[in-house]
């Protein structure tokens, strides 16, 4: 009994700092109940939207009073630190924007909007725990929570063949990736005897410092474990070669959820990758970066760099031939995962900060781009690039906003996307004078060439909007709801402001580099 009491005390203490997650859990259940109670109410959409935003606001309010010091929760299963809090704010913003967009659009019938909001809260909860996970068990459980609910929402359109096909592919690829990652985790546990990410790092260092025989005996198992865990994370961020689910899911899913999927789970995947690669898979550290340069004889930063180069190249080259804008943005999202992996491959504080800055900027410009896709699709009933011809004449403000988003996605100044991409390249440039500098120089060159490729297919859309004549003689006008107009204006202003004045982003991310180290 006496040995049990400290566990109870620890859980009660942890619960005080687990309140944002508790608010999301309770809110998810309440939204399901409200959906049943107000099933026949004329104001059900407004009530459920207010309920979903209230849940997110409650979580935000509780998150705002979190302590700044890093600490372990629930006996080391989770960590409460500035790094996790940064990503949680990002997830709340993505969730709130998705709720507002979905409430105004036509993708969800009124009788099903409550289910969507409740399931969306569940995904946000899972992403919260992904950002805080410091134990392999919690890593897997949080990843599965996000994945399982995402499968449902990807196929949320009843009777839609593309939605069903995309959801099925998502389930198949997700199930395989989940099993592969779990298999890799089992190897890590077998090698070290622990599931704690921080203890894993210490145990792996001890293994590598052992005799030549013991190191050789464990090297193969360790390599398999690293490859399999990397595959699980690569699936979540849509990196090559684990990206094949992405285009079909993005095209078939309701567009508000596609916008959320392109940012939220991707950011959660990168948060998880940073925790794992800078905690669990940390071998003997470099005096330059303070992080591991190799593990089991493999220079894993270079491996991540290769994945980054292949991901951005394949994503951009495939996007060149797309005629459906959602599929184009899907391949663009794959390419942006490659750019972000550049920061991860730098294995430095600057690299981590560049990932955080880029995810923050990517949230605004990508959700903004999908918002334009929604409003054009509602007017034309199509997502083809042909329907964007002459958009500048049918709705000039929408065309200008979309051009801003696309130029920002390219990474051109003076837009916020340039700042995000600059920090990614800066993190790589810092490594050129150190070990493996030649490889980092090549990675920077590949990234620059891919930016030029991306400019081509983004400009193709811009040309259609401002230069090409409408595809049909009587092109339907594009009508914007007031809410959409406000959001497009806010996104455009944010991209322009942070493209010129990025100091707040840099300071926030610098203050958020405090990871719980065990």
From Swiss-Prot:
Pfam families reported for this sequence: Proton_antipo_M (PF00361)
GO biological process: ATP synthesis coupled electron transport
Residues passing through the membrane, by range: 18-38, 45-65, 82-102, 113-133, 136-156, 171-191, 220-240, 254-274, 295-315, 328-348, 355-375, 399-419, 439-459, 486-506
Entry EC number(s): 7.1.1.-
Physiological role: NDH-1 shuttles electrons from NADH, via FMN and iron-sulfur (Fe-S) centers, to quinones in the respiratory chain. The immediate electron acceptor for the enzyme in this species is believed to be ubiquinone. Couples the redox reaction to proton translocation (for every two electrons transferred, four hydrogen ions are translocated across the cytoplasmic membrane), and thus conserves the redox energy in a proton gradient.
Similarity annotation: Belongs to the complex I subunit 2 family.
HAMAP family: NDH1_NuoN_1
The protein's name in its UniProt record: NADH-quinone oxidoreductase subunit N
Organism: Anaeromyxobacter sp. (strain Fw109-5)
Organism placement in taxonomy: Bacteria, Pseudomonadati, Myxococcota, Myxococcia, Myxococcales
